[in-house]
C-alpha cells in the first residue's frame, strides 16, 4: 500500500515504483542495521573507501565556471537541467568578461555572499552588457521528466513533499503538481533579483554560506553549487550595512574574473570529480549518514535532512570520460 500511494499518474508509474522500492530498501536497511554490532553497517569513510572509479564522474567543462578572487579560485558547477536560460546567460556574461573587475558587495552572516556591479544603479557608470541579457524569465522550478535522475531521501521534508538528489544537486519535487526544483543548501548558487520575478538574469549571483534558507526555494532561480573554494567566501568579513552589504568601496572584494572551464587550457584547470548520486554506493552513503557508525557516536538519528548530505568532491583519480 505504501508503494501504491506513491503513484501519481500512469505515465510515470514505472519510475515511481523503482524510486519507491529504492527508498523502501534504504528504510529496511536502517531498521535491520540499527544495532552498532552489525558488521555490515559502514561509516561514511568506509563507504567512500569502497567506491569504484565508476561511482565518480568528471565535471563537464562547458558547465563549470571558475570565480577567480585575489584569495584563490572558487569552482562552481552549473545546473543546466534546472535553469538552462540562466546557465546559458551566465556563461555568455563570463565569455564577454562582464564580471571581470566587479566585486563581492555583500557578506551577510549565516546567509549569503553576493557579487554584482557596484555601479549598477548609475546609468553612466554601470557595466555594459554586450550580447548576454540583463533579465530573464524566472526558472524557479521545472517539470518532472523520466530523463532527470532523482535519488529520493526516505525521511520526508518540511518544505517539500519529496527531497533527494539529481545529478549531484539537492532537489525537491511534488508528484501531484509534476514539478521539481533545486533547494537552498550550503554552497548553492542563485541569481539575485528585485521584487518582480523576472528581474534577475545572472548579473548578480549569490552563494549560501549559512544555515539552509529553504524559504527561498522556488522564489529565486538556483543555477549551480560551489564544489571547491567555499571557504574563500564564507570566511569573508561580514558587511556592516543592512543585509550585510559593504558600506565602503574599500571593503568590497574584487573579482579578477569568471571563466567557463571549457575556455581554459587543460593545464590550468582544477581537475575534480564528484560522487555520483544515482548509484547503490550513494544509497549506502545516505544510510551511513542517517545512522552514524563512527565510534564517537552513541546515538543514531535514523533519519537525515537534505542539506545534511554533502555530496563528496575530490581530485580526479579515475580516467575521465571525454566531455
Locate each region found by the language model.
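Bacterial N-terminal signal peptides that target proteins for export
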Residues: 7-21
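Cyclophilin-like peptidyl-prolyl cis-trans isomerases
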Residues: 9, 33-323
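Bacterial N-terminal signal peptides
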Residues: 19-29
